[in-house]
Design a protein with these regions (language model features):
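Non-catalytic cell-wall polysaccharide-engagement segments
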Residues: 2-57, 106-121, 125, 129-204
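Short linear capping/connector segments at secondary-structure termini
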Residues: 45, 82, 96-103, 107
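N-terminal carbohydrate-binding/catalytic regions of secreted carbohydrate-active enzymes
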Residues: 60-67, 78, 82
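Short, charged helix-capping/linker segments at alpha-helix termini
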Residues: 67-76, 137
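Short, functionally critical alpha-helical segments immediately adjacent to catalytic or ligand/cofactor-binding
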Residues: 73-90, 97, 120-124, 148-153, ...
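Flexible domain-boundary/linker segments
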Residues: 80, 84, 99, 140-141, ...
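Glycine- and aromatic-rich loop/turn segments at beta-sheet edges
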Residues: 91-100, 170
Length: 204
């Protein structure tokens, strides 16, 4: 083999090694081409961790049970963060979901659910709907997760409205939706316009 061919092979080997190293470094990232542009995306399946009170962690077996039942078991840490924001694991309606349409056992009025397990089942069932409507691809899909979380707080009608208006959640459109609902219902307040960030402070 002549010297030029040996050098060419070495350069090829170096390029392969460098390329493999770059791929290893970017790990869970990849790229796809859509609408004429290159877009980057994460491996959305990787869950984070929740930093919550022991009162919330005491419900982890039930959270895991119902998250699995409704096909969102990878979101257990998110649900724990959600419960931390809603109730810190205290009281009976730990998911604060008594007004949800899945509550068919008790009055759909604030705080009417007297059974923590039923609250967990109902809240997780509803959150699963919110995730589906938001098109959330996994617990690492933070942009769509924010949309689903705001939908849990406002009601799922917000999700479709926000997608049509802005393509997803923004604090500005959450405020606009809240103002619109206050006017329609004649209420002083409507929901928490920064609910996603209030939940996600417990989720990393």
């Amino acid at each position: 083999m002549n010297k030029q061919k040996i050098m060419a092979n070495r350069r090829r080997d170096i390029i392969i090694i460098v390329g493999c190293t770059i791929l290893a470094l970017i790990g869970g990232y990849g790229w796809s081409r859509g609408f004429g542009n290159f877009t980057w995306f994460r491996n959305f399946d990787t869950p984070g961790t929740a930093s919550v009170d022991d009162a919330v962690l005491n419900y982890e077996p039930l959270i895991q049970q119902y998250a699995k039942e409704y096909g969102i078991e990878s979101y257990v840490p998110v649900i724990e963060a959600l419960m931390q924001q809603e109730s810190s694991g205290l009281g009976a309606d730990v998911m604060q979901c008594s007004e949800c349409y899945y509550n068919t056992e008790y009055d759909q009025t604030p705080g009417s659910i007297p059974d923590p397990e039923y609250s967990i089942q109902t809240g997780i069932h509803y959150f699963a709907d919110c995730l589906e409507l938001a098109g959330c691809k996994g617990p690492g899909d933070i942009r769509r997760l924010r949309l689903a979380l705001q939908g849990y707080n406002f009601g799922h009608n917000y999700i479709e409205w926000a997608i049509k208006r802005d393509g997803g959640y923004t604090e500005a459109n959450a405020q606009a939706f809240s103002d619109m609902m206050k006017e329609q219902l004649g209420w002083e307040t409507y929901g928490d316009t920064t609910y996603p960030e209030h939940v996600l402070r417990y989720y990393k």
